[in-house]
């Protein structure tokens, strides 16, 4: 790997006669996460963290498309949304980027806490609470508990789906009042006059 341009190697095993510097660690996975968190913290950048049972990717794409009209935006590619993919996405950031739109996927308790420590989002968005990963999370209440671990470390705003029966019960978390979006007029930010135009896309008014 040194011949291919690597500045150093991170390894769980001692290397015999290494051809360059290497860092010996107990866990390369944990080292990946720690280095990513350090790198993210070194950048003057705003981070939007997106999670939810369904709709994460389309929400990420929409938010990134809107923000990119004014800012230099980096977004999660493919399904790089777990404890390996998220750090790799963060390593793609440069000083030229102004906003990162990061998808954050989990399947068990504690994962969101670890992801949030890495990403350190300024804003978090939760699309909904559905019936995914029940093998570990057991119920929608379990999914709600796991997803809302993101509230512990979000820096500024919490944006929630006000049409979701589990999410709309949240009034305040860690001193922050959620901003609600949805299809119903009871949400401060909602959609009206939805028109589906087939291959031309969908049109709507945001109120």
Where are these regions (language model features)?
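Adenine nucleotide phosphate-binding catalytic loops in nucleotide-utilizing enzymes
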Residues: 140-141, 172, 176-207
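Pocket-edge structural micro-motifs
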Residues: 26, 133, 193
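Phosphate-binding loop of NTP-binding sites
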Residues: 14, 30-162, 168-177
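Hydrophobic residues at beta-strand termini and immediately following loops
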Residues: 25, 76, 181
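Short, polar loop motifs at secondary-structure junctions
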Residues: 9-16, 162-166, 183-184
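Short, solvent-exposed coil/turn elements at secondary-structure transition points
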Residues: 15, 28, 79, 184-186, ...
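N-terminal leader/targeting and accessory segments in enzymes
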Residues: 1-34
């Amino acid at each position: 790997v040194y011949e291919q341009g690597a500045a150093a190697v991170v390894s769980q095993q001692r290397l015999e006669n290494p051809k360059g510097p290497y860092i010996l660690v107990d866990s390369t996975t944990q080292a990946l996460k720690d280095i990513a968190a350090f790198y993210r913290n070194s950048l003057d950048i705003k981070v939007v963290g997106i999670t939810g049972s369904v709709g994460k990717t389309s929400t990420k794409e929409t938010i990134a498309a809107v923000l990119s009209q004014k800012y230099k935006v980096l977004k999660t590619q493919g399904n790089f949304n777990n404890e390996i993919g998220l750090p790799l996405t963060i390593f793609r950031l440069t000083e030229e980027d102004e906003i990162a739109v990061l998808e954050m996927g989990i399947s068990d308790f504690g994962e969101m806490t670890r992801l949030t420590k890495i990403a350190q989002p300024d804003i978090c968005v939760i699309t909904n609470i559905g019936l995914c990963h029940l093998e570990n999370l057991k119920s929608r209440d379990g999914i709600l508990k796991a997803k809302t671990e993101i509230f512990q470390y979000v820096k500024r705003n919490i944006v929630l789906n006000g049409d979701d029966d589990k999410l709309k019960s949240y009034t305040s978390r860690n001193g922050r009042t959620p901003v609600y979006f949805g299809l119903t007029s009871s949400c401060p930010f909602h959609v009206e006059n939805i028109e589906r135009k087939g291959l031309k896309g969908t049109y709507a008014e945001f109120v």
